[in-house]
A protein has these predicted regions:
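Hydrophobic faces of well-ordered beta-strands that scaffold small-molecule active sites
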Residues: 85-87, 134-136, 176-178, 204-206, ...
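Active-site gating loops and adjacent loop-to-helix segments of metal-dependent hydrolytic enzymes
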Residues: 81-83, 87-116, 146, 242-275, ...
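Aromatic-lined glycan-binding groove of carbohydrate-active enzymes
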Residues: 285-290, 294-331
């Protein structure tokens, strides 16, 4: 199960089985079954995703079709030379995995995926897929549960691991989003600036709430202000819910339905992760983040985390109640302040829904490696029946523009 809670949260919830609905016997059964469960975890739910989309476009939408197998083959052959920048590609280290895994089986599973492998295996997968560049980011929840100076030092070590490791060993193949100690906002802002100016990082990636606060909270404004000043984006990756939310939304009193971690998958990659990011996006608009930081840029993965599906309802209802409090129409912020990626959602109909509302100029390619097959993602996109110009924008040109890099 790639989608699980960090060890400390998991342990706390299992110290009180009556409260958290996990008896000792159920725990042991779950752990004994872990290898099978891990295999069917995050990838299973993501590959089975259905109607998600995204939201808001000024220009006419790009139309996707896949009329016949022959036409698909012709399009795919035409675009075999397409270049790719992967904008959501995950890594970890033995130290980080030890912090954020629930047991030894889970740690072994993450090792088997290649999450901590930043050498020949990863480069080989990139070459096989035809992925030119990976933008690396630390596995959720990263260091956001590590308090004080310990978290500050840990974030620095993770960032330096990339600079001194794969970025130095394979020049041009790896870029990175900074890991930030967001629980210490001033230090996080300083580490963002240091990593961008000294090490050439492209921005930062966050993982859900920070001590039960989202990025619209006043405490986190130093990070937003620094990102805007540096002209670098922040990627909103999902995180795990606070315990109170987990209990109300995702837990059950029927312990036989927790033996295979149904509630954890439900609260994570099976559903909760996507709802969590979408909520944070709406909060950032509604509570004036982009009025205070008008040029701040936010990236959202997983084909918009459900936003396209809900787009007209959200815009219709939220526009009315924010017209006096916001400086611009509600939906305009989606045009001006958000970018979206394809990570892990390799489906034509989802991309079509995304492009119905979001300009093709604000969509970027991503795979979500190693939790999905990288080649599956590039093969899928090569066969998407879009004009070559639009496909180049999504595959690499939009990322080149946003991050000021070249493939």
């Amino acid at each position: 199960v790639a989608c699980v809670y960090p060890a400390d949260v998991f342990a706390e919830r299992h110290q009180h089985p009556a409260q958290h609905n996990f008896g000792v016997e159920a725990d042991m059964n779950a752990i004994e079954k872990t290898p099978r469960n891990l295999v069917m975890g995050r990838r299973h739910f993501l590959s089975g995703a259905t109607a998600l989309g995204v939201g808001a476009g000024i220009s006419a939408p790009a139309i996707i079709s896949r009329a016949t197998a022959n036409e698909t083959s012709e399009v795919s052959l035409r675009d075999q030379d397409l270049r790719f920048i992967g904008t959501e590609e995950t890594f970890s280290t033995p130290e980080l995995m030890a912090l954020n895994t629930i047991n030894e089986d889970h740690r072994l599973y993450l090792e088997e995926t290649g999450l901590a492998e930043l050498g020949p295996r990863r480069i080989g997968a990139m070459d096989e897929a035809g992925l030119n560049v990976q933008i690396l980011s630390a596995h959720t929840p990263s260091v956001q549960n590590v308090p004080g100076q310990e978290g500050i030092d840990f974030a620095y070590r993770l960032n330096k691991t990339l600079v001194d490791g794969p970025m130095a060993t394979y020049p041009g193949r790896f870029q990175a989003f900074a890991t930030l100690p967001l629980q210490s906002p001033e230090a996080a802002a300083d580490e963002l600036e240091r990593s961008v100016r000294e090490d050439g990082f492209l921005g930062a990636l966050t993982n859900g709430h920070i001590g039960k606060k989202y990025l619209d909270h006043p405490d986190l404004e130093p990070v937003l202000a620094r990102a805007e000043a540096l002209n670098v984006p922040i990627y909103l990756h999902p995180g795990y819910p606070p315990d109170e939310v987990f209990q109300i939304y995702y837990s059950t009193t029927r312990s036989n339905y927790t033996e295979e971690y149904q509630d954890y998958i439900f609260s994570g990659s099976g559903y909760g992760w996507h709802q969590e990011v979408l909520t944070q996006c709406i909060r950032m608009i509604t509570y004036g983040v982009f009025d205070r930081f008008p040029t701040l840029q936010i990236i959202v993965g997983h084909m918009g985390e459900g936003l396209p599906f809900y787009y007209k309802r959200i815009v219709g209802d939220m526009s009315e109640v924010t017209e006096d409090s916001l400086k611009k129409p509600f939906e305009q912020y989606f045009h001006d302040n958000f970018w979206f990626t394809t990570s892990a959602f390799f489906q034509d109909e989802l991309l079509h829904l995304l492009l119905k509302y979001i300009s093709v100029d604000r969509v970027m390619f991503a795979t979500d490696y190693p939790f999905v097959n990288m080649k599956e993602g590039t093969d899928w996109f090569r066969a998407v029946n879009l004009p070559r110009e639009d496909k180049e924008k999504i595959a690499f040109r939009n990322a080149e523009k946003l991050f000021r890099i070249k493939v």
